[in-house]
Amino acid sequence: MKKKTHTITFNSAIYMIKTIFTMLFPLITIPYVTRIIGVDGYGKVNFISSIMGYFVLLASLGISTYGIREGVRVKNDKKKFDSLVSELFTINIISTIVSYSFFVLFIFISDKMQGYLMIAFVLSIKILLQPLSLEWIYNVFEDYIFITVRTIIVQIVSLIVLFVIVRNRQDICQYAIYLVVSSAGINVFNYIYSKKYCTIKIKCNKNMIY
């Protein structure tokens, strides 16, 4: 399954464009959000989001690193690559279920989280969407054009969503929704576009990767 590859210079230039957009984005969103919902509201959502990051990390289970390493070896054999992706996708679903279970348990046993339940459950959608990430596939095939274009599109759409739904000081939960839209957009794009490189199926057998 040979795909067109680009030079290191080209890939570096594309990646630099993505990096510039990623750096500029917070310069627009953070001042707007802190002005509308206040520093306290911004801090609350980002505090919960930082906690959620640990559960997302648990759900990812180091699959991206393993996928890149093994994917590079078999990327020219579609059958083997499909098998690798399907097995890792299945493992990721299982790890996501486990991680989300820990999240629910944590939410209800932590006194500090009781005042943030709505925000926490909105942001927890990030955990559930983790299996759709599949970012490692595009790193295997060095498809930095897709990664860059996808990132820019999602950031622009997310910015529009932010301006539409976050309009006053009470829109703290709406800000959490905006964060989910940013994350979900990338993951959904990744899953849909992955069909260019592989066929993903739920695959369970005794010879799973780990």
Regions found by a protein language model. Name each.
Residues 54, 58, 97, 104-108, ...:
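Alpha-helical transmembrane segments of multi-pass membrane proteins
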Residues 34-42, 108-117, 142-187:
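Membrane-interface helix-loop junctions in multi-pass transport and translocation proteins
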Residues 6-64, 159, 183:
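Signature of the first transmembrane helix
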Residues 1-4, 8, 145-148, 172-174, ...:
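Interhelical loop/hinge segments that connect adjacent transmembrane helices in multipass membrane
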Residues 9, 73, 117, 128-149, ...:
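Membrane-interface junctions at transmembrane-helix termini in multi-pass inner-membrane proteins
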Residues 1-25, 79, 86, 195, ...:
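N-terminal membrane topogenesis motif
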Residues 60-76:
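Helix-loop junctions and terminal segments of transmembrane helices
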Residues 43-44, 78-91:
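Membrane-interface alpha-helices at helix entry/exit sites of multi-pass transporters
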